[in-house]
């Protein structure tokens, strides 16, 4: 196997880890996800992990310094808000039905927030004058697989540990946001 292909696969796995963590969280907090909703998670995370390097590549160096300073803050605040909301919902027993709801809005926000690193990788691809098709395809496929795997593993953990696992899920999202913020 070509060393550049190995490098792309390693990058894809690294980029997919945030999507995996979020999917794991969703798996153990949203126990009633249907197969089609699980597929949506994989498709959304895979699509945004695929498209963000393309957008980063297009932006290239023209606005990279501005974007690289603002993007982590956007991801942090999105994940912080969603994480705090999950914790609040888990502590409010009257709102238990909200925990199991599926939301395209939340899914989109999570997919965007976890793909900020992929955007930065796209800027790097532009600086290295790399082609995009193969790396972006691999990144998207790996994110898709990791997201779906995360949900299934999370569902198993959620069944084992119970409903209050949502507090941990919210904390995980907040920690991912902090990691993104500190990584820049």
From Swiss-Prot:
Keywords: Cell membrane, Ion transport, Manganese, Membrane, Transmembrane, Transmembrane helix, Transport. It is a multi-pass membrane protein. Probably functions as a manganese efflux pump. Disulfide bonds: none annotated. Its main location: membrane. Coiled coil: none annotated. It comes from Methanobrevibacter smithii (strain ATCC 35061 / DSM 861 / OCM 144 / PS). PANTHER family: MANGANESE EFFLUX PUMP MNTP-RELATED (PTHR35529:SF1). The chain crosses the membrane at residues 5-25, 38-58, 67-87, 107-127, 133-153, 164-184. It is found in: Cell membrane. The keyword Oxidoreductase does not apply. GO terms for molecular function: manganese ion transmembrane transporter activity. This is Putative manganese efflux pump MntP. GO terms for cellular component: plasma membrane. HAMAP family: MntP_pump. Belongs to the MntP (TC 9.B.29) family.
């Amino acid at each position: 196997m070509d060393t550049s292909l190995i490098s792309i696969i390693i990058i894809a796995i690294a980029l997919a880890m945030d999507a995996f963590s979020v999917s794991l969280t969703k798996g153990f907090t949203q126990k009633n996800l249907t197969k089609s909703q699980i597929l949506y998670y994989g498709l959304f995370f895979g699509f945004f992990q695929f498209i963000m390097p393309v957008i980063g590549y297009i932006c290239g160096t023209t606005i990279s310094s501005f974007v690289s300073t603002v993007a982590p803050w956007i991801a942090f605040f999105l994940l912080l808000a969603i994480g705090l909301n999950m914790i609040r919902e888990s502590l409010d027993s009257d709102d238990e039905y909200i925990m199991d709801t599926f939301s395209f809005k939340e899914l989109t926000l999570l997919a965007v927030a976890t793909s900020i690193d992929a955007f930065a990788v796209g800027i790097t691809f532009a600086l290295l004058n790399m082609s995009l098709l193969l790396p972006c395809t691999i990144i998207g496929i790996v994110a898709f697989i990791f997201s779906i795997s995360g949900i299934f593993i999370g569902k198993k953990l959620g069944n084992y540990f119970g409903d209050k696992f949502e507090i941990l899920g919210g904390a995980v999202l907040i920690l991912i946001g902090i990691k993104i913020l500190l990584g820049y």
